[in-house]
């Protein structure tokens, strides 16, 4: 083990998914802690001996290897290394997440570091913490990028296609409503010929008119969504938040090739990956202190740009090997570290009950939900259920 007295200094930074996997001795796949009958750790669970080391000095899980002479041997039967039990104070595990999750520290707080980082340089590209929260919790969609050149080039052709489709829908609506009206008149004539009462005729006409109104409204709604989607698509820009799910589906189905986006932490991860931090830092510096002849920013926007520059510059810091000191992508978790079991112990009380650390309950909840999500994804469940 490392001696605490050997350190001159310590630096705290963001841990990347690869770093967490490197620290880890294995993936924790099951939420179980110990078997309450044998009182031994469950395999692949939160106290697994294969991952964290043996509970008894110089003894593997199955008991095949005992004593110090087998030091360093990994049992071929149970996979546990024969070593001291104190390694359970230092060996870590990890949980592979089925879907990425945003670290709450960087979303909420006195400042939302994610909101400052992901905000664009134009006023319309401003992103607030509450908006990001909606994206993260699957209540809104985020436009990550737009192929503006291709859209501009194809816009006349797309508009012509839209006009043709709109005309076709209107013609279909008129035909359908005329057909229903004719069917109603024929039915009423037959009822009258068969001696139907005035009350019956009136009731049938009222029901039919209700159906006609509903059908007309359905067509109007379809045309309205089409018009709204087209207007939205023409002015679509990166970092735009769209809360209307029906409108987003229409945009994605029709013109999904022209833009990228989505909801959840995945969308934020895509946006972070698109940021060129070197270019962004230069742009922000020129915005804060513009060259002579250029219009300066307002006081409020200048203050915001200064705060954003601090974050971008901090993420742009490099070590002696040219690697980033802190990776911004690490604010979004793909892997959760599991601390050593002896730092979150289970203690047996009188009467056979156990006292356990709150961390074990937290890990158990994360693993249960993660496994449930993995099963849904493996089954190919619809997106609306997964989200």
Task: Indicate residue ranges for each PLM-predicted region.
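Extended, highly charged clamp/arch subdomains and adjacent linkers
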Residues: 1-387
């Amino acid at each position: 083990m490392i001696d605490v007295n050997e350190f001159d200094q310590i630096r705290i930074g963001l841990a990347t998914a690869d770093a967490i996997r490197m620290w880890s001795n294995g993936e924790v796949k099951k939420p179980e802690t110990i078997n309450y009958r044998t009182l031994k750790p469950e395999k692949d669970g939160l106290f697994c001996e294969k991952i964290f080391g043996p509970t008894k000095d110089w003894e593997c899980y199955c008991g095949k290897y005992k004593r110090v002479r087998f030091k360093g041997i990994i049992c071929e039967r149970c996979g546990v290394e024969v070593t001291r039990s104190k390694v359970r104070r230092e060996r870590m595990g990890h949980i592979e997440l089925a879907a990425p999750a945003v670290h709450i520290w960087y979303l909420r707080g006195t400042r939302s570091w994610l909101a400052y980082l992901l905000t664009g340089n134009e006023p319309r590209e401003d992103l607030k913490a509450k908006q990001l929260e909606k994206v993260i919790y699957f209540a809104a969609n985020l436009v990550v990028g737009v192929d503006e050149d291709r859209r501009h080039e194809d816009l006349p052709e797309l508009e012509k296609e839209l006009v043709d489709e709109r005309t076709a829908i209107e013609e279909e609506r008129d035909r359908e409503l005329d057909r229903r009206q004719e069917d109603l008149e024929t039915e009423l004539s037959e009822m009258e010929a068969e001696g139907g009462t005035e009350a019956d005729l009136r009731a049938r006409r009222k029901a039919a008119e209700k159906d006609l109104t509903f059908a007309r409204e359905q067509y109007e709604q379809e045309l309205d969504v089409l018009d709204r989607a087209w207007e939205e698509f023409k002015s679509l820009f990166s970092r735009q938040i769209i809360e209307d799910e029906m409108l987003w589906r229409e945009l994605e189905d029709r013109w999904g090739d022209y833009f990228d986006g989505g909801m959840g932490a995945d969308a934020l991860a895509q946006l972070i990956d698109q940021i060129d931090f070197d270019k962004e830092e230069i742009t922000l510096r020129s915005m804060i202190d513009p060259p002579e002849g250029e219009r300066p920013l307002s006081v409020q926007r200048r203050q915001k740009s200064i705060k954003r520059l601090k974050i971008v510059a901090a993420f742009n810091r490099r070590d002696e090997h040219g690697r980033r000191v802190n990776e911004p992508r690490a604010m979004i978790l793909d892997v959760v570290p599991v601390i050593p079991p002896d730092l979150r112990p289970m203690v047996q009380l009188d009467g056979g009950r156990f006292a356990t650390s709150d961390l074990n309950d937290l890990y158990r909840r994360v693993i249960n939900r993660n496994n449930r999500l993995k099963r849904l994804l493996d089954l190919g469940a619809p997106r609306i259920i997964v989200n």
